[in-house]
């Protein structure tokens, strides 16, 4: 009751503050009540008030903001559990130049078998040391180390013994049930002298001899501690839809591939959009291209670590969603189901027991529900803060020590203690996703003639260099307008926003290889679907538009010499078929134009969601295209409903960003493209 009263009190204070703000606005601004954009009113009066004098009627509600750069505690409440243990000598930081590291970096498949937990050795192994190790030194300076890892091993972390790994477990309620029925009932910390009750007594186990019974108890303890959750993680993250969604989200995170192409054509930065529990947020303070400033091993390590943290964050988000749905009745039913497994578990081996427990506590129905809702769109700033949070918990001062969380994780199961196998799995999956998404190979320059990405999401269908019809369509953006016989009827023009919405839906599941690295540039025979344009699917119509455009430009040039400017746009005719095709840079010069000055889509803003179904329907209505959308792997249409305790995780994308009405006119003018040719 006390907690309920406290929540009501906090809600009352919040509502009281909002009422004070609105009352003060309506009193001082006569136009406020007539305006429809409440967000603009609050922005105008909170961040740029006309009268900044101090009020005499108590604390100013406008100044009740969260302290800058202070991490909110609600972030820690998301999943604040850590596993603090000794750093294994076989960690990634001690494997430079070894065959294990080379095989790890070139991973081309995400499907693998998990060995028996009794087969492991996390010793340093055969490595080329630069100097003799000190007593209890965990990180060894190696001859093949990069400058970053050398700094970490030799000076910054030479005496570090342990690290805090973010927890990769089931929700606490589920984990406690497994411990109670597979290991033994939890003891009261104040009553440790009482007799400990084992989950499986000697009479419950069919094995002969005390040694065999003890071994079976250890096996079931391993299943409860890490075996069942390890199998559940593997089943979730190797699901084809999750791999597709993860790669799509990582393209947003790194402004990579087709997301980079949209930015090149429309100057809209989709990496500003992030999602969490079904709501879409826009944050303009993110820098999505900082990884392009790195080279060699540093670039590989940074991208690998970012993807690893992304997977950790995705699993913890899924467990957070699941945890909130577990009520007393659900917990009671789960206890009964796990208890009913005991006769089968008593005689099962490790693999069989893991499968039984995982199928019970993490059934296919739950897995399918999570598949369509994770992972979220996450930007690099979020993951950088997550990295800092983990290092702070591990006593690693990030300002002077360039250590990454992935440096402390072994590369194979055989070289790791089983309690870290979940981290080994996610790190190995991160290496596969890195190669599968071609993030390290991204070019520094941006041009429609360059392969910005060779992954299955982009090549060949979304890359103009591999898709001639798509290239012709891009060169026709803003170059024509089609009208019907009725002059007052609605016409069609291929605008950047119409093209972008259709372009982002351009995905063919039959050409997507989720479990293997199959690149179009290396093996074209593996791709069956013929590349087409995004909006104008009829090749003859597209060719006619391009021919008409070229013929008109040649006709203009025949009238005389010199340079001819388009009277509407000022474009130099005859020098470039379309301004979009020019070589543009968005690498080191990304920060020359602040992201908040970039034009948005106005009323057709692209949503950072899976497949952009709603946007695609709008494109087809505008274009009048009879083509049907292709069947896609991905999520359901983003929901616009609330996200209360009973609704969290049900929708994707949520609300799209609302454009600023003060910039709407300028945005429309900036997206007009070049001149239009009437029929």
Swiss-Prot record:
One of its GO terms (cellular component) is host cell cytoplasm. The modification Phosphotyrosine is found at residues 252, 564. Its main location: host cell. Residues 235-353 form the RRM domain. Residues 661-679 have a biased composition (Basic and acidic residues). It comes from the Viruses. Keywords: Chaperone, Eukaryotic host gene expression shutoff by virus, Eukaryotic host translation shutoff by virus, Host cytoplasm, Host gene expression shutoff by virus, Host-virus interaction, Inhibition of eukaryotic host translation factors by virus, Late protein, Methylation, Phosphoprotein, RNA-binding, Translational shunt, Transport. Pfam families: Adeno_100 (PF02438). One of its GO terms (biological process) is viral translational shunt. Induction: Expressed in the late phase of the viral replicative cycle. InterPro entries: L4. Residues 552-679 are annotated as: Disordered. It is found in: Host cytoplasm. One of its GO terms (molecular function) is RNA binding. Might be cleaved by the viral protease. Phosphorylated. Tyrosine phosphorylation enhances preferential binding to tripartite leader mRNAs and allows ribosome shunting. Residues 178-232 are annotated as: Binding to host EIF4G. Monomer. Interacts with hexon protein; this interaction allows chaperoning and trimerization of hexon proteins. Interacts (via N-terminus) with host initiation factor EIF4G (via C-terminus). Interacts (via RRM domain) with viral mRNAs that contain the tripartite leader; this interaction allows ribosome shunting and expression of viral late mRNAs. Protein that inhibits host translation while promoting late viral translation by ribosome shunting. Blocks host cap-dependent translation by binding to eIF4G, displacing MKNK1 from cap initiation complexes and preventing EIF4E phosphorylation. Binds to the tripartite leader sequence of viral late mRNAs and recruits host eIF4G, PABPC1/poly-A binding protein and 40S ribosomes subunits on viral mRNAs, allowing ribosome shunting and efficient translation of late viral mRNAs even though conventional translation via ribosome scanning from the cap has been shut off in the host cell. Belongs to the adenoviridae shutoff protein family. All late proteins expressed from the major late promoter are produced by alternative splicing and alternative polyadenylation of the same gene giving rise to non-overlapping ORFs. A leader sequence is present in the N-terminus of all these mRNAs and is recognized by the viral shutoff protein to provide expression although conventional translation via ribosome scanning from the cap has been shut off in the host cell. This is Shutoff protein.
